[in-house]
């Protein structure tokens, strides 16, 4: 393999041109057409998700404080740091505030850039401040404000336009998210050698948009920023494998997509681990030349170290599977020439798999144990809980949420009704038939080193990894659905499904028929999305925040459920002790202590816990103490019976809070005191 690989790029790519060229179209015109269509579908995707977001929230008619409340749970946490930077006296002072933060986890200072992957907020704030200053000096109209009448609620001022910090932020999110369609188009072209394949891929994405992304509902989430770079990285990688590239320029291109993806989302490390596994599969099948493989692994190693430094030495990056797998694949790549004499393919695959697996797991365990890093322990606990009876308080908080549960049958049904899954399976079957007819599974030969479709094998293995992730955790279907769309594009590859034996007109007619079949259910899906109309309003939370602003000190410390705490920090700027970013062992311990307010522990013990944490007020919602007869282990009462069995026979604190709220008698909950209880929703306890 090594002998052939050395000349892989010198001998020229195995396809002509930069992208595959259809007959009758010159190279430059072909490339220009592909680039322009890709940019156009990206713009359409941007417009679509922007429209869906506006329709759902009626965002243009909300006041800024309502927009802040609309960023629920961790979305509000992330946006709060953007707000901190743009309202600071200077950009550098704003960055200093978030790298020496004492508000998010009251009681100690944290570097939120290290912990929360906040580079999107830093970049957008960096762009917003000079943009706003330039607009002001040039007297540009970048924001329009008016008064909105809200019926029984007080009128508010609503401002619209790119000059508004919220609009600047969400526009940045949606511009980045729009590129997903661009990358999918390019990937469709690459795997099908056809513009029609790219169009087919994008149409599948559009027709299954609701099962492919949630950026239109949750813009500030980390995946909204990172996934476009992940899918863009996959497109670049597919191009490099297809054309057997290994130059420094291609190395830098891979790094340029990998670094933002790693900086923007903690889960990217796991996504890239699956990519490493997929590359390993293609390389071990002799489908990726040695020089190309070296370029790929160097890019991952470089991207890792750049990101590690920029995230101030994020410990979880060291302990995650991604870093060990890079070294494992590098070892496989660099020792593979020594194994060139092994012609029996199963033996060759077994040896490489043992090397790859043992190094990955060995380094993973070694780094975690040696450095005492437990930040990612909850991930393996979640996976363990899905296949065994194991459960604890932390796994329940995840697995009781639908998005962290197994994929729902309804999702499979929807993707099947639009023919996405059936056509993807047809594509896989057609490709497998063609590939297996040309490839020896038993013996490695020199001819196999020139086998085509290395990029397709990589993407199919990546699809398997993505599907596995989605089946285990429904939230991760954002990886599976786009890759199913890429796979369907294979049907436009003229070498499959009959190849040259079928006339071009017949093949084109079949593909047009496929599009018509996809559109039959796909277009109603788009209409259904566009018909979703809503208007955000949360008067109870608005009243709560008004009370906090008027009746508590600026340094008063709050605790409560994770979703509410993020909004308390964002809107009232009060210090909090817990928050929704749960991927750190320290915050998991803190949250367990805070949630003891829903346990059956003695009142005095819980009060002492709150005092030690420096909490002044606890925000409580009656729904926090609800029962669920269908899944009793998924409410706080049941979670605490499981977590703290020795106190399971005692009276639940939930019952005491509710009794005190209804009777307006604090004697049963002393030394706690209810200081806010205007309705049957939010209650504030003073510690």
UniProtKB/Swiss-Prot annotation:
As for membrane topology, the entry says:
Multi-pass membrane protein
Task: Tell me one Pfam family matched here.
Answer: Dpy19
Q: What is its EC number?
A: 2.4.1.-
Q: Which domain of life is it from?
A: Eukaryota
Name its cellular compartments.
Answer: Endoplasmic reticulum membrane
Q: Which GO terms describe its molecular function?
A: mannosyltransferase activity
The membrane spanning regions, by residue number, are 24-44, 170-190, 191-211, 223-243, 253-273, 276-296, 303-323, 324-344, 347-367, 415-435, 454-474
Respond yes or no to whether keyword Iron is given for this record: no
In the record, biological process GO terms are: cell differentiation; nervous system development
Under CDD domains, the record lists: Dpy19
UniProt-listed InterPro entries: Dpy-19/Dpy-19-like, Dpy19
Question: Is Membrane among this UniProt entry's keywords?
Answer: yes
Write out the GO cellular component annotations.
endoplasmic reticulum membrane
Q: Which UniProt keywords apply?
A: Developmental protein, Differentiation, Endoplasmic reticulum, Glycosyltransferase, Membrane, Neurogenesis, Transferase, Transmembrane, Transmembrane helix
Give the function comment from the record. Answer: C-mannosyltransferase that mediates C-mannosylation of tryptophan residues on target proteins such as unc-5 and mig-21. Mediates the attachment of alpha-mannose in C-C linkage to the C2 of the indole ring of tryptophan. C-mannosylation takes place in the endoplasmic reticulum and frequently found in thrombospondin (TSP) type-1 repeats and in the WSXWS motif of type I cytokine receptors.
The UniProt similarity line reads:
Belongs to the dpy-19 family.
Q: Supply the name of the protein.
A: C-mannosyltransferase dpy-19
* Gene that specifies this protein: dpy-19
